[in-house]
Amino acid sequence: MARASSSSGPLPPLANVPSSWAQPVGAGEERDEGRRGGLGLLAAVSVPCPDFSRQPWAPASASGPMPFALQRLRATLLRLHREREQLLRARDCARHLQAVVRLLRSGSSAGSLSLQQLHGDLQLCPSRGAALRLGFPGSRETLLLTRPVGLAAQHLEAAIEMQLRSLGRTPASLGLTSQLAELLLALPFYHTLQGHSLNFVPGAARPFPAARVLQLLAAERGCQVADKLAEARGGSGLQEQLRRQCEQERELLPGLLGLVGGVASTDSSGLRLGGPGALWSQYWTLLWAACAKCLDLRVGPWEDPRAMAQELSQALCQAPLPQECEKELLSLCHSLFHQSVICSWDQGFCQALGSALGGQSSPASLSPTSELLQRLFPPLLDSLRQPRPELRLCPPAGPTPVALGLCTLQTTLLWFVGRAQQHLAAWDPGSFLLLLQKDLPPLLSAVEALSSLASEAALTLEVEQQLGLEIHNLTEKMQLLPKESLGLFVQECHKQATQGFKLHMPRGRYWRLRLCPEPPSDPSEYARIVVYSVLEPVLQGLQGLPPEAQAPALGQALTATLGAWLDHILTHGIRFSLQGALQLKQDFGVVREVLEQEQWGLSQELRQTLLSLSIFQQLDGALLCLLQQPLPKNPVHRRPPRCCLCYEVQTTELPTSSLNSLENLAPPLRLGVSPAQNTHLLSTLGGGGRGGGGGGGPGPSPEAYLVGNQQAWLALRLHQHPRWHLPFFSCLRTSPEP
């Protein structure tokens, strides 16, 4: 500014004239000139007048009023003087901006310009107080000057940051240290400009404290290290490259940290980094954190993050590295492993959801959905077994393994319950039993392992602890699925059998027929229809399973079917004659007939186990109740009729309060029937056996046949009380079994 003013030469000061000369006319002239000159003249009016204490250039003895022409000349000179001052200051500001532009356009280091020249140019930037002293009354004129200064500070910040990043990408050498020292020496001058620009445009530029310089250098050098490590993948090259990069950084660090430490000591506004040890540790942490971040970005969807994590883990175990390096790279390995878990889980979960819409189980293999759900658990279990880094700059992105495990468990539970209900609603017991016996056990094992690891893992976050508790609760719920599913299966078997008996089992006279010479030898058609419709799909579904897996389901199905049979008889109050009881005994034998078929492949031990169920003893007890047919209270003894073929039955009165005497129950001996036929009838009745099939061998004790509703079964017997009796014509008597 001073050089510009002296080059043009100052104008001589105007003489001090009386105020009476200038006031009335000067004010008017100033207003006239302001209207003619526009904005520039208005700005000129506000410029302070020169100092009139100096020696006047005109004679001071002038007296009297100043002529009008002289007044106009004086006002014009004052205006020109002020405009000249403004132009000089604007020229100085333009020179300053040109210097900044030259710096920005240089494209090289800050040393391409002389530091003394840069310092001088930066000092030309006026502060807010200096701008006000220029005479600008409003904010518009101030912004016209200050906005370029703020813009220059922003561009200069970008140039310095670019130079620091460029130096960070330069290979380690002595030239790198000298270039960095040259750039760091220019930072105080930049901070001066940045402080001036903040007076006009807050936030126009940011300072460069030592922490920011260190972070920029470490970020670029970390990326360079990551590129070299990525190229050295495979074999033992990764381990050697890690060792080499650590040695190179150790050689560069003393000079680099010395320069940055010097900047930190001279910069009072920056972040203090502490002593040399703190600088060293912070640089290593930033360097390897940047390296880990770049390696993470280089692993795209076309690469396997799990393989890279394994290679890095092996290299870290074999190469002696700084603590900061091991810490950050181990965190990277954990992050890559977590990414691989999320990627594999996401693919498998989508496949399982798509397969859940269909996919039926086959006797030889698991259902496709069950296999896909099982594949989701091993990666999650491996992830929970991995040791978690104690401290990471940023946790891995995406859901945690505990959250993925909870989602998998919920999906498994919903799929199993929905599929089980679907099979039972369609009465497809084969698919249901395959789901229960083949698909559920391996899923339960995986779920229990997940719950065990989730409870043992060190879950520090409160959210993870809540997720672990949810996993534990759902695991307990899934452990009850076999029992609950079997209960639903029993209910559905009972329902299907009840509907079948209600639809097909006859009532009325079918069960009240008179006793025939030959006992029934074939079961009824309804028994085959109902028993086969309920038990045959169950036996088909259990084919190929071991006996220990067949026994529970088949036993429950038999219990439900036979229980529904007995309940149907009691509910509808079907009354049985002796002939009807014998026919019911043959109908019960259909169950044994089904179990003895060779196509189902049931072992002899399993058959004996099934036939020893308590439901078969209840069948025998009900049959014994029905076979104990009472006689009239006052029996009439008559001679055999001669006019027709009638039979007189000889019986003994049995107590009706207990069935203990049924072991000695003798069949009604018929007159006119051979002893061999009577013996056959005795064996038929006395061999009450298991399963209603007339099996040989001694039966259980009489107490085993006592049913809880004994009186209800006794009430279903057909009492033989004749309605009338004509002793003179026995052929017209009422049949005891109409």
UniProtKB/Swiss-Prot annotation:
Coiled coil: 69-92
Keywords, in A-Z order: Coiled coil
Keyword Transmembrane helix included in the entry's annotation: no
Compositionally biased spans, kind Gly residues: 685-698
Keyword Coiled coil: yes
Renumbered residue ranges of the record's region Disordered: 1-34, 682-704
The organism's place on the tree of life at top rank: Eukaryota
Name by which UniProt lists this protein: Coiled-coil domain-containing protein 142
The species this protein was found in: Mus musculus (Mouse)
